[in-house]
Amino acid sequence: MDFVNNDTRQIAKNLLGVKVIYQDTTQTYTGYIVETEAYLGLNDRAAHGYGGKITPKVTSLYKRGGTIYAHVMHTHLLINFVTKSEGIPEGVLIRAIEPEEGLSAMFRNRGKKGYEVTNGPGKWTKAFNIPRAIDGATLNDCRLSIDTKNRKYPKDIIASPRIGIPNKGDWTHKSLRYTVKGNPFVSRMRKSDCMFPEDTWK
């Protein structure tokens, strides 16, 4: 997948259904991306790169597309895939995963079962046992990788405003969150909107 030359919003959509693999020292975790958010850098008031601000915590966001930008929010580790050329702080937040391999270990790591295991940006990273130290690594050149060949394809994609970013003017309401329609592993899904996971893919 080209993380440098494509539009960040298109990358966020294209990532839906892509297989994520994390290889721990003793365990392999896999799953399929069902929810993403695009962050558009310098002009995006909700983005960590808004206005070109650079601090030690966001250094990875300014690296070349395909870099992993990992940051902690309210004790939860959030994983972003950096997009664009070096120096342009855009990226895609991976918000939720439909789990596949390593379920028993995920249950232990999270202390939860069912859809709660991976239906949020800090939930799936804990389920996959991903460490903060992965920040700045290059996707597919470290323990975290994606598989764009053995992937799934959503039947429908929904675009909606991003989660948890009030008071950012127009950027609060822009539809930059992308979800696999009806997939129960999407965060904040109403039960009435849920479908069986297998029915949400082509």
UniProtKB/Swiss-Prot annotation:
Gene3D superfamilies given in the database record: Methylpurine-DNA glycosylase (MPG)
Gene Ontology MF terms: alkylbase DNA N-glycosylase activity; DNA binding
SUPFAM superfamilies given in the database record: FMT C-terminal domain-like (SSF50486)
Keywords, alphabetical: DNA damage, DNA repair, Hydrolase
Keyword Phosphoprotein appears in the UniProt entry: no
E.C. code: 3.2.2.-
Transmembrane segments: none
One Pfam short name: Pur_DNA_glyco
Keyword Hydrolase applies: yes
Record-level GO BP terms: base-excision repair
InterPro entries (alphabetical): Formyl_transferase-like_C_sf (IPR011034), MPG (IPR003180), MPG_sf (IPR036995)
PANTHER family for the chain: DNA-3-METHYLADENINE GLYCOSYLASE (PTHR10429:SF0)
NCBIfam families: 3mg (TIGR00567)
Family per record: Belongs to the DNA glycosylase MPG family.
Name of protein: Putative 3-methyladenine DNA glycosylase
Taxonomic lineage: Bacteria, Bacillati, Bacillota, Bacilli, Bacillales
